[in-house]
Amino acid sequence: MTETSEAVEIAVGTPAAKHSESFVFERSIQTVGRRKEAVVRVRLVLGTGKFDLNGRSLEDYFPNKVHQQLIKAPLVTVERTRNFDIFALLHGGGPSGQAGALRLGIARALILASPEDRPALKKAGFLTRDPRSTERKKYGLKKARKAPQYSKR
């Protein structure tokens, strides 16, 4: 028995596995998520729900519980929190941007793993790339839109 088939049997044996035939894939699924200045490369592998973010655990990398919930949301939506291990390389941006980028990358990877989950993820808004980014500062102004105080005389 190969290592892949053993992993598939473990994943199928878990109660959260609804569609066992869609979990069969030879190698890991790789996707990219972006938000603000953050870029995250996600690798989804059959496993037990472990996160490896730049070599650290989810709790170490994102101590904020809000960010942790944001990241786990796509997995919770499709009820697959314990079926996959997630390895991610995060760079650029801050914690909020990286968390949003990781969420998008995970959602995209889940669709490649099981396409029947697409409607649920799309309805929840996990597949939409947030286009908002920082507006540049203009000369003559203090910030992007904040002008210096106007004095008539």
Curated annotation (Swiss-Prot):
Residues 122-153 are annotated as: Disordered. Keywords: Ribonucleoprotein, Ribosomal protein. GO terms for molecular function: RNA binding; structural constituent of ribosome. GO terms for cellular component: cytoplasm; small ribosomal subunit. It comes from the Bacteria. SUPFAM superfamilies: Ribosomal protein S5 domain 2-like (SSF54211). Pfam families: Ribosomal_S9 (PF00380). The keyword Ribonucleoprotein applies. Residues 129-138 have a biased composition (Basic and acidic residues). GO terms for biological process: translation. Residues 139-153 have a biased composition (Basic residues). InterPro entries: Ribosomal_Su5_D2-typ_SF, Ribosomal_uS9, Ribosomal_uS9_bac/plastid, Ribosomal_uS9_CS, Ribsml_uS5_D2-typ_fold_subgr. Gene3D superfamilies: 3.30.230.10. Belongs to the universal ribosomal protein uS9 family. PANTHER family: RIBOSOMAL PROTEIN S9, SMALL RIBOSOMAL SUBUNIT PROTEIN US9M. This is Small ribosomal subunit protein uS9. It comes from Mycobacterium leprae (strain TN). The lineage of its organism: Bacteria, Bacillati, Actinomycetota, Actinomycetes, Mycobacteriales. The gene is rpsI.
